[in-house]
UniProtKB/Swiss-Prot annotation:
Localisation per UniProt entry: Virion
A Pfam cross-reference name: P1
Species in which this protein is naturally found: Pseudomonas phage phi6 (Bacteriophage phi-6)
Protein's name according to its UniProt entry: Major inner protein P1
GO MF term set: identical protein binding; RNA binding
Function: P1 is the major inner capsid (core) protein of the polyhedral procapsid, which is responsible for genomic replication and transcription. Forms a dodecahedral shell from 60 asymmetric dimers. Binds to RNA and may be involved in genomic packaging.
Amino acid sequence: MFNLKVKDLNGSARGLTQAFAIGELKNQLSVGALQLPLQFTRTFSASMTSELLWEVGKGNIDPVMYARLFFQYAQAGGALSVDELVNQFTEYHQSTACNPEIWRKLTAYITGSSNRAIKADAVGKVPPTAILEQLRTLAPSEHELFHHITTDFVCHVLSPLGFILPDAAYVYRVGRTATYPNFYALVDCVRASDLRRMLTALSSVDSKMLQATFKAKGALAPALISQHLANAATTAFERSRGNFDANAVVSSVLTILGRLWSPSTPKELDPSARLRNTNGIDQLRSNLALFIAYQDMVKQRGRAEVIFSDEELSSTIIPWFIEAMSEVSPFKLRPINETTSYIGQTSAIDHMGQPSHVVVYEDWQFAKEITAFTPVKLANNSNQRFLDVEPGISDRMSATLAPIGNTFAVSAFVKNRTAVYEAVSQRGTVNSNGAEMTLGFPSVVERDYALDRDPMVAIAALRTGIVDESLEARASNDLKRSMFNYYAAVMHYAVAHNPEVVVSEHQGVAAEQGSLYLVWNVRTELRIPVGYNAIEGGSIRTPEPLEAIAYNKPIQPSEVLQAKVLDLANHTTSIHIWPWHEASTEFAYEDAYSVTIRNKRYTAEVKEFELLGLGQRRERVRILKPTVAHAIIQMWYSWFVEDDRTLAAARRTSRDDAEKLAIDGRRMQNAVTLLRKIEMIGTTGIGASAVHLAQSRIVDQMAGRGLIDDSSDLHVGINRHRIRIWAGLAVLQMMGLLSRSEAEALTKVLGDSNALGMVVATTDIDPSL
């Protein structure tokens, strides 16, 4: 499906191997770093750049090809000094002296503007700072929409970037749908639930090594500080297998932060000026509470490695650490008292002038994952698909609603009331003003449970799998009973700590097939984010797959629902629903990947059932296929195609070579940005499984022809960009976000622009393949 040639890449760019950069988001939120091979030192880079600039000056190299090389440099952002690049770009007088027209074309292609006001013979006099600003605009920051399509994709996309802890005991999962085209509202879930676990993981981290890492990454955005802390915590967690010394953790954190940002830090340990001058670090340095406390501890006890009680750890150290790390984030942090609590960690973000309320909580019982829930509301009388109104619901109210989904391992709340009530065996009423509701939550128990002891004891017991004597005596080996006890305890604790919400006595309501469900009467002075088209969501999972539950009947918020009851006898842990309207069990996508290696054609087919057999559940493919996500991808796809068509038309009517090159540069930038996003999708979740299967089969074919050893996948690995792009397109088709015809049209446009060649120009792909 996606077959682009790499042969035509300019050979002079082969030295720039393994350079991978994806630019920066706004507010110094770095999402990538430049990875340089061992042989690619700055000395080599400078000599190569000088040689190529000399050739450009003599007119021997296509300025477009060399401009693409500069474009890759510019995308690196702070990882590779843009100032240094611009200095080299402007100081070589041979270029302007020998061929000013080539220089003008080169500048036009890089900046995307021919700038007719500057004459060709005066290009060399352009101030370096002006070109610097133009180069910085190349970092693709406007189209980060794939961070916001689905909760599943966000989880996998953020993991390799360090915003979440990959492969740890639990996974951060965040759901956020932004209003088009404001795709910058990344939820600050880096410091979500159970920070103590992350802190304890730092106990075995070599602080000197971490210091050296911070110092080496000094040119990067300050958000990488929390990224490295998270990565270090993950490494330490795997290394120590859960055996932590909390006191050593606190000492390590304070030592690291104190040495890095204390006013008394030796100059040689101080971060670079670039890092120090950013807003995040300025705020962090001004947070003297952490540093004063650190210095006082050293002064009083003579050393940083001190002993802290649990009370000190929970009431003083962790809040200090959270407060310090919050200054690195471009978003406002949750209140400390809510962040360190067990239930209802919330964040109030003022994004683009609009309030955005997020609740983050840990799914304790079934899956160690973090869920972020953003209440959103559409205009009921509008056909628009984008979320342009968010109700002003308080953090406390969101915190109270969170355990509702928490009980049944809900990754996020489902599409609308209809799905919840019909699929989850419950009933409910929401009055017309949206300020009062009666919700029926499923329980799968046969008798009521009285809260005759501390609810947190029950929660702790169920979290750890330890059932005390009283609970065991009441319901021996009764998993349903335990789940209900846990549910009741969580709800009781949540509402008891929230004066804004009043919950009546719960009661068991008989239902069909021996199942029961609870009824809670919840009322508040605030608007409740429940109702038709009011909540966008995710999935409720079960250990074994069930058939889809279709729902497509629009329900008005004022209606009273009596839901159908599911047979829960064989599903004791959670309920499974399909959170989308089109509930068909089949979908078509391009399942064949083809590639030419050494003039031989190889094709690998990847079927749906094979992907599911690898543990990739179908709902992980089709999770959250609401009209919102589909509308976003459609609008984004339309933007790319329409913009490319407009630029192509403008190029046909232009008579100025520099202006044509400027248009080519803009088209290339758009295409490269698009390809990187598609490739990113191809590296996540089910896309990675598709890549693995296709690679394995191509290896088998090559081995069968005697071209490689059975255990070698060398020749497949070098085509990783192409196969990841194919997988990304296939996943988008599986989700229904792109049709097969749209994907084919997209590949044609990208092929015409040679965007794939641009993506691989700075990697180790052999152009001879």
